[in-house]
Amino acid sequence: MSELGFYRFANSHPDEIAIVEPSEKIWTRGELLAKTNQLTHALREFGVKSGDVVATVLPNSVEYYISYLACAQSGFYMVPINWHLAGPEIAYILEDSGAKAFIASGEVPAMEEACQKAVSAINFPEQGCISTSQMSGFTHLDEFISSQPITNPEERTAGQVMNYTSGTTGKPKGVKRALIPGDPDDVLSMFAMILSFFEIQPQENNVHIVGSPLYHTAVLVHSSAALHYGHSVVLMEKFDAEQMLYLIDKYKVTSSHMVPTQFHRLLQLPDEIRAKYDCSSTRAMIHAAAPCPIHTKQAMIEWWGNSIWEYYAATEGGGTVVDASSWSKFPGTVGKAWPGAEIKIINDDGTEAKPDNQGTVFMKLGEATKFEYKGDQEKTKKERLVFDDQVYFTVGDIGYLNNEGYLFLCDRKIDMIISGGANIYPAEIESTFLMHPAVADVAVFGIPNEEWGEEVKAVIELNQNFDSSNELLAELMKFAQENLAKMKLPRSIDFIEKLPRDENGKLYKRRLRDPYWENQSSNV
């Protein structure tokens, strides 16, 4: 039996710090466990059973971890939903996941409005609507759990997180893994072993800082793993470069999960600001989610030294890992296969590519990480390959392995835009624009943005009865704002007489996209 696991640590060392909220209010392990247990009892009393889904739309907050830890010890699936989504987008995930309970926040007016629109659109049962702030039609979390005991539940079994990841069809798909029977501490500390890939050890006064939204798969994975490893977690409401340096210095932060956009913003700080704060406590400042320009990473290594780590993985699984020293030998690599993983580069004819030859990147599907796309067996099967009696999966990325086994990415999922570490799928945006009567055809793609990596651009072919004008441009922008999350909104829209398609209707999107990338060091 493992000695790790948040619930064990909370029972044996209840006075240790678990969470530092964005307000810098401190929660001990014992306090966090007490609220977690109350929510567990309340959800079960409400009728949520093992295998059922609890969905959340929450900002970075202690309630995020209370919700996660309650699901994780009860056999529930937690479905974290991006709080930037519009009402119809939230409604789709609530309905598709079959959520029995919905925990939301109204601290931000737009978030409250989107959540209320979502539950109204699908007639979600009001008794299953719980909020962390005052919201019409929702029961406040404090009231929902007020009559419940803080004692550990008698029956405990490990739950799972089911993240939704968009596909080329534009509709999000739930990445669903089977529940693993067993003590939650044992099961969850097994998954927390991912931290060992970055030489992070249990306890040892480690402190993890969260500067990205917790609805991102990896951010919740790494920060919850930190709790199961006996670490403290410092929360930021949103990323602010100087604030992160302040918190690293104050709390002697040792680890974080970051994206290249955050590196860029840190490096943009004046030298006198950077010099004010001591970052020598950092040991594993891990980055992923988007390509990192070589010059940006080199600058971060010069500043933070060997604490800079990188990995390659997906919501579906992974992956590779590389430390600063190895990366410096092979700049641009995303690393070697981590323990237990295997990477293969497969040609279009199904054969294995030779070193330094590009192909589709496939990763071995481990027993503990087997998944299916909820409700889409066709997609599940389509993106798998049996090779040497092992099952591999792909997310469509193109790359190659060098002779030493280091992976280099050349391109990624067809047409996907990565902006500030967030995956944005053009098909969903295109489908939205096609609902407008003026739009005959549309292409959405990413163009360079120095800060965010990429930004969204739309090129629209108008119907015959419409002419391009500033008024129509404003109308289309307003239409997008009403139907899409802010991060998916085009920064610019161009009108075109005819989009480049072949006789079969295939869009030559690269003819539109490539001119913007001609002078860029990377088109990933």
Spans of features found by a protein language model:
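Conserved pre-ATP/AMP-binding loop-to-beta segment of ANL
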Residues: 14-15, 129, 134-136, 143-166, ...
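Conserved AMP-binding/adenylate-forming core of the ANL superfamily
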Residues: 15-61, 65, 69, 86-91
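Conserved AMP-binding A3 loop
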Residues: 28-30, 160-189
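AMP-binding/adenylate-forming catalytic core of the ANL superfamily
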Residues: 41, 85, 91-92, 102, ...
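Structural core segment of the AMP-binding/adenylate-forming
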Residues: 45-46, 73-147, 154
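Gly/Ser/Thr-rich phosphate-binding loop
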Residues: 162-166, 228-229, 253-258, 269-330, ...
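Conserved ATP/PPi-binding loop(s) of AMP-dependent carboxylate-activating enzymes
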Residues: 340, 351-385, 424
